[in-house]
């Protein structure tokens, strides 16, 4: 028997009305983002309310409610709202890395569209205005959000530029390279630069910079190598701190769990048991849902 989109919307409705959190997460985990979008439309058509609103009404306040509501909402809208929150009051610099650097060109376009729809403002303008220009890390964001990358066909020259910039502590040049180099060329530049330096790029950057300046460089570096590398890096940071960063774990999970296989591979390469880390760091209500979404035991 073929399961239709309407059937899935009904299953989701039943899960929400019975507050079956594991079923809500399980349904999200079982279907791709495009399939979930169809379910969202069917849910709205059948019930007259959005799935995210229904989930928030059915569940108690807290991180679990946020996670499940994010799963069943448009990713661009979720990202737009989270960025808006991150820019409210004192900027949440960790969240900005998660939401701006860890974001594809297509996802950024959708986020900008949703942001303008929701707030009648231009996201790029608001972001640059709020973060200012005093801190070095903002230079990466200035280039990154344009999503204008192209091959320069000068791998040798770019490798020398990168090595020289690290040696001279030239943050501006590195920020510009991270924001404008094509993904394919960046990987080649990095391979050659690491031979010249005799160490990995992350080791070289870590020897020169620290705190948010370093965090943004590393995030952009990992994202260009592969988004799953950055997702794992951010999750590990959130899990291994003195106090688990639930908000970051929820952000990364809600917006990235479709790539769970690649992220788990990155974790396995590092010899990191991400399933055990989730179980240890999170409470008994949230941990099972996170593990369902990442498909770990």
UniProtKB/Swiss-Prot annotation:
Would the keyword Repeat turn up in this protein's UniProt record?
Answer: yes
- Repeat (Annexin) residue spans along the chain: 3-72, 74-146, 153-222, 226-295
Could you tell me which Pfam families the record lists for this protein? Answer: ANXE1_4th (PF22293)
Q: Does the keyword Transmembrane apply?
A: no
Question: What's the main place this protein lives?
Answer: cytoplasm
One GO MF term: calcium ion binding
Q: Which residues form the signal peptide?
A: none
Q: Name one GO biological process term.
A: cytoskeleton organization
| Compartment list | Cytoplasm, Cytoskeleton
Please report any disulfide bonds recorded for this protein chain, giving both cysteine positions: none
Q: Which GO terms describe its cellular component?
A: cytoplasm; microtubule; plasma membrane
Keywords (A to Z) from UniProt: Annexin, Cytoplasm, Cytoskeleton, Microtubule, Repeat
Annotated family: Belongs to the annexin family. Giardin subunit alpha subfamily.
Per the entry, what this protein does is: Giardins are involved in parasite attachment to the intestinal mucosa and in the cytoskeletal disassembly and reassembly that marks the transition from infectious trophozoite to transmissible cyst. They may interact with other cytoskeletal proteins such as microtubules in the microribbons or crossbridges, to maintain the integrity of the ventral disk.
What is the recorded name of this protein? Answer: Giardin subunit alpha-6
Q: Which classification does the entry list for the species?
A: Eukaryota, Metamonada, Diplomonadida, Hexamitidae, Giardiinae
